[in-house]
């Protein structure tokens, strides 16, 4: 799988520049407006010079070697058009409902971070994974920056979204991501699959992994 970020220099993860600046101040240790002006100007200049050519080269290589592609932080209808034209398989962390609806309508799997479910929203102030799930537009959960959040989110999702049962929630961290990247030998308990399994105990609403099997052999 190859993932690339937003390709157009006119796009921002945040449509509100005030929120963008607040985000970078927190992330950058208190940068001033003047420092942010320099940072943004430099990054947009790099993007304008290199983004299109690099993206076209990456997409061509991915298609040649049959490597699935993922878009990242799609925000606008224009981003959706790019994703469709590039034959993207997965859309990581769309930042607006507008983009998510367009991606979903195009048949592209939508991926959100499991921490987004666990903490009740995006750490950067973008759309909540549960809001997407309520509209039937959440296909895959990734661990993002907290690996242990995968199981936690799979257990919590049915509580937040009654239309999603536990089996469907578990598929967001097993079968669906495996299928999205072409790994047909894993992702579900079925004849002919790898038999990668875990045994989980739930204690005080938290999942605790008790046993692990890899290709049918217990390894933990």
Where are these regions (language model features)?
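Small/polar loops that bind or transfer phosphate-bearing groups
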Residues: 1, 71, 91, 142-143
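Short, small-residue-biased leader/transition segments that mark boundaries at the very start
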Residues: 2-9
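Histidine/acidic residue-rich metal-binding segments in metalloenzymes
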Residues: 12-110, 122-137
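His/Asp/Glu-enriched, well-ordered alpha-helical/loop segment
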Residues: 106-116, 120-200
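Short, small/polar residue-rich loop motifs at catalytic or cofactor-binding pockets
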Residues: 205-207
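Short aromatic-centered micro-motifs
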Residues: 212
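Glycine-centered positions in the ABC transporter ATPase nucleotide-binding domain
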Residues: 215-216
């Amino acid at each position: 799988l190859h993932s690339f970020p937003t390709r157009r220099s006119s796009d921002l993860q945040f449509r509100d520049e005030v929120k963008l600046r607040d985000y970078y101040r927190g992330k950058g240790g208190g940068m001033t407006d003047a420092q942010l002006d320099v940072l943004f100007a430099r990054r947009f200049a790099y993007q304008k010079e290199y983004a299109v050519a690099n993206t076209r080269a990456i997409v061509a290589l991915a298609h040649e070697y049959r490597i699935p592609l993922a878009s990242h932080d799609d925000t606008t209808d224009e981003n959706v058009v790019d994703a469709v034209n590039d034959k993207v398989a997965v859309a990581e962390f769309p930042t607006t409902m507008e983009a998510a609806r367009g991606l979903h309508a195009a048949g592209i799997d939508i991926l959100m971070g499991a921490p987004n479910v666990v903490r009740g929203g995006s750490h950067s102030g973008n759309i909540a994974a549960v809001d997407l799930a309520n509209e039937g537009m959440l296909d895959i959960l990734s661990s993002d920056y907290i690996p242990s959040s995968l199981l936690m989110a799979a257990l919590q999702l049915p509580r937040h979204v009654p239309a999603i049962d536990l089996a469907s929630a578990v598929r967001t961290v097993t079968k669906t991501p495996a299928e999205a990247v072409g790994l047909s030998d894993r992702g579900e308990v079925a004849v002919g699959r790898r038999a990668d399994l875990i045994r989980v105990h739930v204690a005080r609403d938290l999942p605790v992994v008790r046993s692990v099997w890899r290709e049918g052999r217990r390894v933990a």
